[in-house]
Structures are given as C-alpha cells and as structure tokens.
Regions:
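Conserved active-site alpha-helix within GNAT-family acetyltransferase domains
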Residues: 145-164
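Conserved acyl-donor/pantetheine-binding loop and adjacent beta-alpha core of acyl/acetyltransferases
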Residues: 78-108
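Conserved GNAT acetyl-CoA-binding A-motif
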Residues: 132-144
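Active-site rim helix/loop that mediates acceptor-substrate recognition in acyltransferases
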Residues: 42-70, 78
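A short beta-loop-alpha structural element at the N-terminal edge
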Residues: 16-32, 43
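C-terminal "cap" of GNAT-fold acetyltransferases
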Residues: 6, 167-187, 198-204
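Conserved acetyl-CoA-binding loop-helix of GNAT-fold acetyltransferases
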Residues: 108-111, 117-130, 152, 156
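A short, internal acetyl-CoA/4′-phosphopantetheine-binding micro-motif in the GNAT/acyltransferase core
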Residues: 94-96, 106-117, 143-144
Length: 204
C-alpha cells in the first residue's frame, strides 16, 4: 500500500511511503526505531519500550505493519492477538473471558519525527484493519494522558475512552476501545458505541 507524504522533516514534500506487513527479518529496524523515537520524547516514561526478543516474536505471531521510505523504516504499527492471555486489554474492560479471543491489542504505533504531520498513525491503523484475523470484533489500546498527540490520533481514528487506570506496573494510562461492529465517530469519553462500560477515571 502506497501513501502520499506531504512533508518530511517539517518541509513540504511529495513522495510516497510503502506500508507493508513486516516479518521477523524487520525486528532490528523496529527495535531501533522504537528506541530512537522514545529517546527523543520529552517524557520517555509515556512509552514503555519492548525488548528486541518480544518485537521479533510479535513480528512472527501477530500483525505488524511497517512504513518504509525507500530502505528506511519511518513508522510502524504492532497489533497483538492476545487471546486468553491476561495481557489482553479486554481483561480490563469487563469483557467476558469467553469473548477475549475476539479482541486484539493495539500494542504500539510509532512515527519518526521526520514523518509526522502526514496522518501516518491513522493510515497504519487503516492498513491493519484490512488485514485483521477473521473473528476480531474489537481492538483495545492504552495511551498516556500526557501524550495528547497520540490520544487525539486514537480518538480521531474511532477509539473511545473506557477508563483511566494504572497499568504496566504503575503507569497512568487511558484504556481505549474500538468496537468494529459499529459506526465510529463518537469519540466522547462517555463510551457510546463501543459496547464497553465506562469505568470511573482514576482519582475522581
């Protein structure tokens, strides 16, 4: 899938980026991009990094899309099929365990600063949705409340806020959900349209 880049490094540009399914051979590039982007964040704690070994496993077992500018990886999206694993975000949304197999985790969406401003997070998600495993009815995600850029992108893409809670051993996160059997667009934190009950916000 080819997408048009309107700017690169903050300057007007007109060239294409290739979005394609990635495999284990791309693990080193994914890992390097993760670390480069995290190191440049004003608050690196907003993003919990993965190990090279975990990324290689995701690339083998799950759905991973890379955005390539020639030979350079400029963006990626990792969607995990967690099934009955306790790490499935469905476990935190009061979804019955027998339905967990129908939910996937939007694990991470990374865009290098050179390529921001092209709507790549949304375009990567759109590419992922065309390649989903049959039977997936919803996607869960987490975003740091301090990461307004990613939160706005997620809401604009159809995710809705389910709750705010501690995750990953004490990190403050919004838990988001996208139900694939509804028409999206209602991104208010009331939870309408997801079929998932909204829980109270942390400390409210």
């Amino acid at each position: 899938m080819e997408v048009l880049l309107h700017k690169v490094c903050g300057q007007p540009e007109s060239r294409t980026m290739t979005l394609r399914a990635a495999g284990p051979e791309d693990a080193a590039a994914f890992y390097a991009l993760q670390n480069e982007v995290r190191a440049a964040m004003p608050h690196p704690e907003q993003f919990v990094p993965d190990t090279l070994e975990n990324i290689a496993r995701y690339l083998k077992e799950d759905l991973c899309i890379g955005g390539w500018d020639g030979e350079r990886l400029g963006a990626y999206f990792i969607l995990r099929y967690c099934g009955q694993d306790a790490h499935n975000y469905a476990a935190f949304m009061d979804i019955p365990r027998e339905e967990w197999d129908g939910w996937a985790n939007a694990d991470s969406a990374i865009v290098h600063p050179d390529y921001r401003g092209n709507g790549l997070q949304r375009k990567l998600l759109e590419a992922v949705l065309t390649l989903l495993r049959p039977g997936i009815v919803g996607i869960g995600a987490t975003v740091s409340p301090e990461n307004q850029y990613s939160l706005n992108n997620a809401l604009a893409s159809g995710f809705e806020i389910v709750c705010r809670r501690e995750m990953y051993g004490g990190y403050d996160r919004y838990l988001l959900a996208m139900a694939l059997s509804v028409t999206f667009g209602d991104t208010s934190p009331e939870g309408r349209g997801t079929g998932v009950s909204v829980k109270p916000m942390l400390n409210e």
